[in-house]
């Protein structure tokens, strides 16, 4: 399941983040890749310990905590500190799979990568290529979103970033450990939550809405790894 979360930041806010990031010290992205990914990875990244990466990463996490779509879709338990990458001049990242568990360098904490997230930071019209391509049993799914919008998809997915042939692509990427580790279960809970919100807005029958809300929370109680 791929979920688009529009407007995490406004285009103007995203443009300000881009200006701050352009002045940063970028390193070869292969420095943070595993043996398999290193063969297909060609981009630049900010070091995870870079003060600017931490500062903007904290801003992203605060913004996500206020985003109802993200909270409902991800049911986050832990969020890996956001990282940042930059593609230009034909750079790309071939098909790969993210590590199942990632350790946070600043602590002994580990994050299970149930969900992967990419937050697009610059205007898609400002660069050619750079699509995120996620492959599953139904084929390939392409994402190249507006500045400030984010795509959320299962961390188990095979995915790649197409070559950027004009301009540059700046993005933040990170992983989410969910209270509910199974994608199918999260999808069902999201569908139920959306239905509950729509029925609430329509002032639906109170008893039926109460039953559906109870079923949602009982399933969450059954499946949550809290």
Curated annotation (Swiss-Prot):
Pfam families in the record:
2OG-FeII_Oxy_3 (PF13640), PKHD_C (PF18331)
User: InterPro entries given for it?
Assistant: Oxoglu/Fe-dep_dioxygenase_dom, PKHD_C, PKHD_hydroxylase, Pro_4_hyd_alph, Pro_4_hyd_alph_FE2OG_OXY
Which BP terms from GO are recorded? DNA damage response; intracellular iron ion homeostasis
Q: What is this protein called?
A: PKHD-type hydroxylase Bcep18194_C7101
Instruction: Indicate the segments forming the Fe2OG dioxygenase domain, all copies.
Output: 78-178
Superkingdom is Bacteria
Its cofactor is: Fe(2+); L-ascorbate
For molecular function, the Gene Ontology terms on record are: 2-oxoglutarate-dependent dioxygenase activity; iron ion binding; L-ascorbic acid binding
Amino acids binding Fe cation: 96, 98, 159
Which PROSITE patterns is this protein grouped with?
A: FE2OG_OXY
**UniProt keyword terms in alphabetical order:** Dioxygenase, Iron, Metal-binding, Oxidoreductase, Vitamin C
Binding, 2-oxoglutarate: 169
Q: How is the cofactor bound?
A: Binds 1 Fe(2+) ion per subunit.
Q: Report the EC code(s) recorded for this entry.
A: 1.14.11.-
């Amino acid at each position: 399941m791929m979920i688009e979360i529009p407007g995490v930041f406004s285009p103007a806010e995203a443009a300000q983040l881009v200006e701050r990031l352009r002045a940063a010290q970028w390193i070869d992205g292969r420095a943070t890749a595993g043996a398999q990914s290193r063969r297909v990875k060609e981009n630049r990244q900010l070091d995870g310990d870079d003060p600017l990466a931490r500062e903007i990463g904290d801003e992203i996490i605060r913004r996500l905590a206020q985003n109802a779509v993200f909270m409902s879709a991800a049911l986050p338990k832990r969020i890996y500190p956001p990282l940042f990458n930059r593609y230009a001049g034909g750079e790309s990242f071939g098909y790969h799979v993210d590590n199942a568990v990632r350790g946070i360098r600043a602590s002994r904490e580990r994050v299970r990568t149930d969900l992967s997230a990419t937050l697009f930071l610059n205007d898609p019209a400002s660069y050619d290529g750079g699509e995120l391509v996620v492959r599953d049993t139904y084929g390939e799914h392409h994402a190249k979103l507006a500045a400030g919008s984010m795509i959320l998809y299962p961390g188990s997915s095979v995915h790649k970033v197409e070559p950027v042939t004009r301009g540059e692509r700046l993005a933040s990427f990170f992983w989410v450990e969910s209270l509910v580790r199974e994608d199918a279960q999260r999808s069902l809970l999201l569908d139920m939550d959306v239905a509950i919100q729509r029925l609430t807005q329509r002032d639906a029958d109170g008893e039926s809405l109460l039953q559906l809300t109870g079923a949602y929370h009982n399933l969450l109680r059954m499946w949550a790894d809290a």
